[in-house]
Amino acid sequence: MNTANTLDGKFVTEGSWRPDLFKGKVAFVTGGAGTICRVQTEALVLLGCKAAIVGRDQERTEQAAKGISQLAKDKDAVLAIANVDVRNFEQVENAVKKTVEKFGKIDFVIAGAAGNFVCDFANLSPNAFKSVVDIDLLGSFNTAKACLKELKKSKGSILFVSATFHYYGVPFQGHVGAAKAGIDALAKNLAVELGPLGIRSNCIAPGAIDNTEGLKRLAGKKYKEKALAKIPLQRLGSTRDIAESTVYIFSPAASYVTGTVLVVDGGMWHLGTYFGHELYPEALIKSMTSKL
């Protein structure tokens, strides 16, 4: 595990948030073993929250939960729930039951399970497109739906993990752009429908976050240097940037914030991302020509 992507006690002692901010709260996190969702969970746990880490891969899920639990005063504050496919509602529903049995309730939900790869439209199979949409969009729906009963009781908050790929045309990312556009729409709809119940619904849209799985998968070797020219703040994001924004959304400071997409990208999307540009347009032309 790259320690540059993890948090420690300095997040509390040198940060913006008091140590007991989320004392007595419980978070349900899908995709919690991934880099982004893990650091989100670490932040919540460091501030007193208990958490259920939900994932498909048993080893990764259990390792993530074990690592995060070391940050908590209560070493029994993190529950690993593995072998859960968010595309299967019954499996997510069962994970919710296990969480409530362990911790008694759910206050916060992070719907962060996601799938992505680099592929142009000509080579994107219907099954591959469906797979990403099902994991990202259907998985987010299933997560929110399965947690609804508990969120009604706690007047809790949902945070969907989105992106900015659907704000403009991004080559090789049509599948994830379509899925994330749906997530944004779902989050806004839930803000309207669940608001009267006291439930808040928001999205977080990370940009180019350094040392993450997503950046390594989507970016070429020369990406970092060239990408900076497309980021107004002239730096790549850090996992701590995501952690801070997540804490804000769940904190009382955002108690009147719902139906919002919080973009954490240094302003990058306003200039157009550099994702895929190393292959554009030559790779697309070659691909399209080969299909004729």
UniProtKB/Swiss-Prot annotation:
Chain ranges for the short sequence motif Microbody targeting signal as given in the UniProt record: 290-292
Q: Which GO biological process categories is it annotated with?
A: ascospore formation; fatty acid catabolic process; fatty acid metabolic process
Protein's organism: Saccharomyces cerevisiae (strain ATCC 204508 / S288c) (Baker's yeast)
Q: What induces it?
A: By oleate. Transcription is regulated by the transcription factors PIP2, OAF1 and ADR1. Weakly induced during sporulation in diploid cells.
Which Pfam families does its entry note? adh_short_C2
Recorded catalytic activity of this chain's protein: a (2E,4Z)-dienoyl-CoA + NADPH + H(+) = a 4,5-saturated-(3E)-enoyl-CoA + NADP(+); a (2E,4E)-dienoyl-CoA + NADPH + H(+) = a 4,5-saturated-(3E)-enoyl-CoA + NADP(+)
Q: Which residues form the active site?
A: 162, 180
* Residues involved in NADP(+) binding: 36, 85, 145, 180, 209
Entry's family note: Belongs to the short-chain dehydrogenases/reductases (SDR) family.
- Where is this protein localized, as stated in its record? Peroxisome
As recorded in UniProt, coiled-coil segments are none
Q: Specify the protein name.
A: Peroxisomal 2,4-dienoyl-CoA reductase SPS19 [(3E)-enoyl-CoA-producing]
GO MF annotation list: 2,4-dienoyl-CoA reductase (NADPH) activity
| Claim: Ubl conjugation is one of the keywords in the record | yes
Gene label: SPS19
